[in-house]
Amino acid sequence: MFNRKLMECSDDEFVRGSQCDEEDEEEQQRQSSQRPPFYENMRTFAPSHMHISCHYDIPYPPHLIQPPVCGVSTFTYAREFPVSNSQQFFNVTPPQQQQQQGTGGSGEEDYCIPKSEDRDHSSNYSQVATKQDRPFVFFASDCQSPLEIVGEVYCTVPGRTSLLSSTTKYRVTVAEIQRRISPPECLNASLLGGILRKAKSKDGGKTLRDSLKKLGLTLPAGRRKQANVTAWTALVEEEAIHMAKEFALVCEKEFHSREIGIYLTKTSLAIDPDVVKRRTALEMSRKVVGELAELLSCDRTPLTPYFPRNMLPIDPSVQQHLSHFTLMTHGFGNVAMSAVLESVKLMIDESIKYIDRCCSQNVWR
């Protein structure tokens, strides 16, 4: 049927139809060349020494972690990315168009997409992409390797809690800087420069912002900090977590739970000799402490990988508060609280054992 109609049409109509088809193809090619750039890599950010387990069934707070996509809100790249299922997760809007620069340019508006020959010379072109209000830590199935870019180290800083004879240098990753300039801390250039041990200079803030801008991080000029400065503000995450692990080890080995539990039990029974009442109170206390410890083990903040994680679901509103505490203490809070609660449970267990061992069996009949 198509061949018959083609034979019936005149030569002029055939030429005009061919020209229309060529114009349509040129229009499609022009539109495809102006297609907005997508992310070349969708990143998961956490310190390089941590293991992050990606589970899509984990409820994350909307402002912190939001599966199943992954990336950073201000980490934007203007490189070509093949069309995939990731488009449904990103509400990408066309960036501002720029005039083509250089000799031989047509002057038409187009997106600043780097050419293949310029891949190795990133300084020769400008990277233009949109910035979306996305959570700063999230996961995706499109990631080639969750730890592929996690270990990007921005710099190393000397520890603030080390002795002069054994100064330890801690790594500061790009992910940590993103967390520090994001809520709840929202550090400004002055505080961030002090944490990174950058020397104060006339253009120190501008230099820091420019270096972060090359990594895709945006640090606004003149911003004010939102959270109060504490002793943990001066620590980097790796040092804070190192302190937490040492604190947990000291609690396990140096906190004498047995002796303290027996002493408290003797003191309480000397005031009120009701053994049944005392044992019931200890059982209820242990239950409450266990519930709190189980809740902390459900924390899904990326800075809490050093204790076994409970896979029970957790309410997003509660996860938001746990993440706030963990981010304010840079990973120290959750680990330290878990260590303290474990010591308290051991103390309660020793108190119950002492009551069962030393008190008369007639009491329980």
From Swiss-Prot:
Keyword Nucleus: yes
Annotated region (H-S-H (helix-span-helix), dimerization), positions in chain: 223-356
Any Gene Ontology CC annotation: nucleus
Entry's Gene Ontology molecular function annotations: DNA-binding transcription activator activity, RNA polymerase II-specific; RNA polymerase II transcription regulatory region sequence-specific DNA binding
Reported consequences of knocking out the gene: Animals develop with normal speed and go normally through the molt. They stop feeding for a normal time before each molt, but average nose speed is reduced by only about 10% and unlike wild-type, they are never immobile. The command interneurons AVA and AVE, which control backward movement, are not shut down during sleep-like behavior. Optogenetic channelrhodopsin activation of AIBs, RIBs and RIS interneurons during wake-like behavior using blue light does not trigger acute immobility and cessation of pumping in L1 larvae, instead it causes an increase in mobility.
GO biological process: positive regulation of transcription by RNA polymerase II; regulation of cell population proliferation; sleep
Keyword DNA-binding: yes
Cellular localisation: Nucleus
Induction: Regulates its own expression during larval development. Transcriptionally regulated by transcription factor lim-6 in RIS interneuron in all developmental stages.
InterPro entries: TF_AP2, TF_AP2_C
Free-text tissue specificity from the UniProt record: Expressed in five interneurons AIB, RIB and RIS.
Keywords: Activator, DNA-binding, Nucleus, Transcription, Transcription regulation
Domain of life: Eukaryota
Positions of the UniProt region annotated as Disordered: 13-40, 93-126
Range of residues in the leader sequence: none
PANTHER family noted in UniProt: TRANSCRIPTION FACTOR AP-2, TRANSCRIPTION FACTOR AP-2, ISOFORM D
Family: Belongs to the AP-2 family.
Assembly notes: Binds DNA as a dimer.
Function summary: Transcription factor, which is required in the single sleep-active ring interneuron RIS for sleep-like behavioral quiescence induced by neuropeptide signaling in larvae. Regulates gene expression of sleep-inducing FMRFamide-like neuropeptide flp-11 in RIS.
Designated name of the protein: Transcription factor aptf-1
Source organism per UniProt: Caenorhabditis elegans
